[in-house]
Amino acid sequence: MTEAMKITLSPQPADARWGEKATYSINNDGITLHLNGADDLGLIQRAARKIDGLGIKHVQLSGEGWDADRCWAFWQGYKAPKGIRKVEWPDLDDAQRQELDNRLMIIDWVRDTINAPAEELGPSQLAQRAVDLISNVAGDRVTYRITKGEDLREQGYMGLHTVGRGSERSPVLLALDYNPTGDKEAPVYACLVGKGITFDSGGYSIKQTAFMDSMKSDMGGAATVTGALAFAITRGLNKRVKLFLCCADNLISGNAFKLGDIITYRNGKKVEVMNTDAEGRLVLADGLIDASAQKPELIIDAATLTGAAKTALGNDYHALFSFDDALAGRLLASAAQENEPFWRLPLAEFHRNQLPSNFAELNNTGSAAYPAGASTAAGFLSHFVENYQQGWLHIDCSATYRKAPVEQWSAGATGLGVRTIANLLTA
């Protein structure tokens, strides 16, 4: 490894010779980032991406002005899926260094897990990685159960079983219980439900290559809520929280589900499948039924659910849906505190009725007459939340993954959302 390039911060503008828009300058001592007080964290992240683009793989964050948030902003832009990068961190007080170390451990886990190729990360591997991460931070305060394959069908998890049965890799439900109270009868404060589709071909409603090439990341919701629980634990979470990960491949085979199939769920709902590429909501429904049965104060589900959310927000914001205005406001406040991008999109009672079927109570996709795809997907999920008008948040994870690099991110996973959910859990 070469000698470290020193990176310093300055509130002064760059020398005019660098141009009036220069955010960094280079001198004999290293590189100086010129902060303007308007968006310093974003400036640091974008500068770090440029520094990585110069091929500089060993840096030392030096001088005054560095804190955990600024160090983290640098790392968010500097980290990339290829190659090795080394950062020598500045001196921070114990609390700030612990916060930074926890972000590096947990959010990097989220990014690396989402970036992993589907060949290496199937449903069982995803569930086990989640168990390992949370057990590492929570120790004996965690218990879990893994249900897979035909056991899912026998126990009535028909959405997850139906979607996953077309793959040689069995579908898996992880039910994890973080109980710091030690009391088996303690009430469950919150349930987190994650979509863990480890590869999504679209099934018989097959995706084009341009839409399939990033579908190793379709388990981004599961990774995000797993990371959020782990991160909340490092921040002192003292309430009981349960995690449900619905993990499967969505592939084509002679045993794969087909258009026109009808799924009967444990809550009595019957769903006609008219698009096998709208599979995420089918597996989440099983997790939401289990979450509702716990009678928690709070249910949060997270999923890379719809292209419609990305059409609305790009990859810059996570989309938030809720009937509970006060709770939605709390999550948006948490997002602001953590400097993470969330945007609330519409969800109304009429969206619940925009999934008509001639053969079942619900269709798994809206018709051309109802084009608000992200809202109708949230409306579908609401049918599996017992008290959907209170205490439920749905996050459509449109900011989880980028197919190509941009000025502040490398290609791949971002890890956005972990801190916001953890903040809400520990508020």
Swiss-Prot record:
SUPFAM superfamilies, alphabetized: Zn-dependent exopeptidases
Gene3D superfamilies membership: Zn peptidases
GO molecular function, one term: metalloaminopeptidase activity
Entry keywords, A to Z: Aminopeptidase, Cytoplasm, Hydrolase, Manganese, Metal-binding, Protease
Documented EC number(s): 3.4.11.23
Subcellular location: Cytoplasm
Residues annotated as binding Mn(2+) 2: K195, D200, D218, E279
A GO cellular component entry from the record: cytoplasm
Database matches in InterPro entries: Leucine_aapep/pepB, M17_PepB-like_N, Pept_M17_PepB, Peptidase_M17_C
Matching HAMAP family: Aminopeptidase_M17
Name of the protein this chain belongs to: Peptidase B
Organism of provenance: Escherichia coli O127:H6 (strain E2348/69 / EPEC)
Lineage, opening ranks: Bacteria, Pseudomonadati, Pseudomonadota, Gammaproteobacteria, Enterobacterales
